[in-house]
């Protein structure tokens, strides 16, 4: 026996050491831009997550129905897509870091007004105004990430940006329920006013990369020198309404982009409505109560969405050279599987099944959405990526605007008695809306046939 042990020790000693896992090379800018831009999404999402976490208490205080509650989420998006096309136009022509910084600085002041409202209509006006700022941020942030990072790490860069809002919304939902129970729901909105204004300074100091500089550069190619942080960036191309219309027309002429727009909008819209009503669902359809419902909803977002985001980001980078249109394939498969799992949780199932399976379903669906912006950067020329992200966001915003309101309307159609009070049946509403995610997955999978031609066209145009 001793001889066997000695032989084993000798073999282990003779075995070559396992090579250390190579560190990810994030390129000349490092991870700082990705972290700062993730912070922008985080702050935006904290504010967005507070409302679902305190919605029941706000309804009791201001006295409005589920339909009006859904309108609060809808208005946030409706006003946003009014400016989404101009936002993409600006992102393709001016300094994107400065655009984001200015929006953040003003956003912090407006956010605090949520705590001062006295009527439903005042609340609606403030929520609608906040939607404009977040819409302007999105195309500029995504366009920047594509220029900061090479294609072999772009999936992870976008994953970091996409994970931050889910973490922020989870924190917003969870904190909102606790703060509202202790000192009232108005204080919950005051928590997010200051950080946004402070983050604006960090964004202002980020370097402005050249458009397209990180798109598959040759090994010997030296990148163009980056502009100093303080240097103004003039318009790079012609401007005006006609230029905006032309850019939109060019973007809409990319078949893969059209599939990405439709497929992602259906999934994102359905998920937006589900996320908006998640806390109320657990309050009404389980014995968890108000604080418990908000806590479970926050945990589902945190664990499911964030884990799905990071896993998907790494898989996109790993698979993109193995399969044609790998980001699209990953998005379609993940959303289809996630939708099937999610539907099962709205049936009459025990809590021990509902909570973990719903978290897994969210991980799949959100993970699929992470691959969408990576695919856009490959099939769209860098000079119109801002408008491409805007057009995609435009359709997603329309679906997202309708979803909370539609779910609220559907819930009011099915009565549910909770503690002697008649409320809307959210489980039935979710069962009607969730199958739309299957349709989005199908559109994504069918759109892969255009990927090769669109990648070649984008490379020649860029």
Regions found by a protein language model. Give the residues of each.
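Juxtamembrane intracellular "pre-TM" segments in multi-pass secondary transporters
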Residues: 16-27, 213-261, 285
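Residue-level signature of mid-helix packing/kink "hotspots" within the transmembrane helices
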Residues: 49, 77-85, 169-170, 302-306, ...
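Extracytoplasmic gate region of multi-pass secondary transporters
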Residues: 51-52, 254-310, 365, 369, ...
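Helix-breaking motifs and short loop linkers at transmembrane-helix boundaries and internal kinks
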Residues: 63, 95, 116-122, 150, ...
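Conserved MFS/SLC helix-loop-helix module at the cytosolic interface between two early adjacent transmembrane helices
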Residues: 82-121
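Structural signature of the two symmetry-related core transmembrane helices
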Residues: 98-112, 327-342
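Cytoplasmic helix-loop-helix junction between adjacent transmembrane helices
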Residues: 126-167
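Helix-loop-helix hairpin linking two adjacent transmembrane segments in secondary transporters
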Residues: 161, 165-211
């Amino acid at each position: 026996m001793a001889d066997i042990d000695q032989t084993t020790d000798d073999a282990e000693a003779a075995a070559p050491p396992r090579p250390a896992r190579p560190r990810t090379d994030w390129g000349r800018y490092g991870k700082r831009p990705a972290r700062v831009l993730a912070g922008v999404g985080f702050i935006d999402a904290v504010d967005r997550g507070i409302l679902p976490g305190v919605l029941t208490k706000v309804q009791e205080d201001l006295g409005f129905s589920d339909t009006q509650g859904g309108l609060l989420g809808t208005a946030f998006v409706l006003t946003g897509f009014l400016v989404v096309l101009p936002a993409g136009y600006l992102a393709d022509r001016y300094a994107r870091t400065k655009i984001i910084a200015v929006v953040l600085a003003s956003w912090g002041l407006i956010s605090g007004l949520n705590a001062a409202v006295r009527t439903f209509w005042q609340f609606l006006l403030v929520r609608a105004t906040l939607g404009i700022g977040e819409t302007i941020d999105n195309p500029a942030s995504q366009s920047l990430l594509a220029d900061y990072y090479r294609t072999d790490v772009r999936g992870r860069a976008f994953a970091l940006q996409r994970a931050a809002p889910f973490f922020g919304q989870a924190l917003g939902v969870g904190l909102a329920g606790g703060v509202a129970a202790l000192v009232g729901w108005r204080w919950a909105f005051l928590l997010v006013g200051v950080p946004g204004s402070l983050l604006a300074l960090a964004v202002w100091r980020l370097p402005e990369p050249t458009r397209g500089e990180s798109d598959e550069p040759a090994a010997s190619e030296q990148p163009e020198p980056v502009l100093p942080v303080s240097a103004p960036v003039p318009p790079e191309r012609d401007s005006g309404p006609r230029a905006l219309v032309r850019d939109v027309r060019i973007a809409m002429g990319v078949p893969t982009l059209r599939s990405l727009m439709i497929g992602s909008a259906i999934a994102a819209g359905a998920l937006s409505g589900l996320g908006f009503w998640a806390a109320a669902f657990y309050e009404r359809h389980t014995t968890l109560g108000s604080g418990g419902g908000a806590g479970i909803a926050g945990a589902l977002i945190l664990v499911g969405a964030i884990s799905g985001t990071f896993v998907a980001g790494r898989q996109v980078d790993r698979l993109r050279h193995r399969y044609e249109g790998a980001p699209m394939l990953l998005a379609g498969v993940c959303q289809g599987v996630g939708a099937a799992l999610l539907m099962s949780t709205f049936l009459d199932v025990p809590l021990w099944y509902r909570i973990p399976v719903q978290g897994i379903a969210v991980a799949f669906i959100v993970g699929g959405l992470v691959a969408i912006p990576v695919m856009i950067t490959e099939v769209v020329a860098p000079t119109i990526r801002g408008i491409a992200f805007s057009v995609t966001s435009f359709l997603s915003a329309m679906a997202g605007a309708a979803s909370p309101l539609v779910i609220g309307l559907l819930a009011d159609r099915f009565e549910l008695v909770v503690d002697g009070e008649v409320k809307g049946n959210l489980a039935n509403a979710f069962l009607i809306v969730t199958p739309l995610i299957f349709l989005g997955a199908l559109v994504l999978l069918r759109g892969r046939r255009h990927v090769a031609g669109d990648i070649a066209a984008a490379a020649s145009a860029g």
